[in-house]
Amino acid sequence: FEKEAEKIKAALGETLVAVHHIGSTAIVGIYAKPVIDMLVEVRDISEVDARSREVESLGYEVMGEFGIPGRRYLRKDNREGIRTHQVHIFAADSAQVRRHLAFRDFMNAHRVEA
């Protein structure tokens, strides 16, 4: 997560506010799928579109909103075509950001439910 987060930070530049580790690999003590999920908060979602080339140079496929209004979705596969990373980008402090982080934090705080 850490190495890839640094690459995303460099590609998105000044608009980036924060990168969070989410998804099953961010929940301690559960069996997780081997895909790193990241939640990225940005100041201006349109800046993400303007930086598509930088993101693609990291090996990501830029998928646009991909079914969720206000989101920018990126995915990355390894050389064998197996998904390794998913990046969900939203405007900083949006309802989607709060929802994703609340779920992750709930699951980490309530191990039985996880």
PLM regions and their residue ranges:
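Short, solvent-exposed loop/turn elements at beta->coil junctions and helix N-caps
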Residues: I22-V28, R72-Y73
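Catalytic metal-binding acidic patch
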Residues: V28-E47
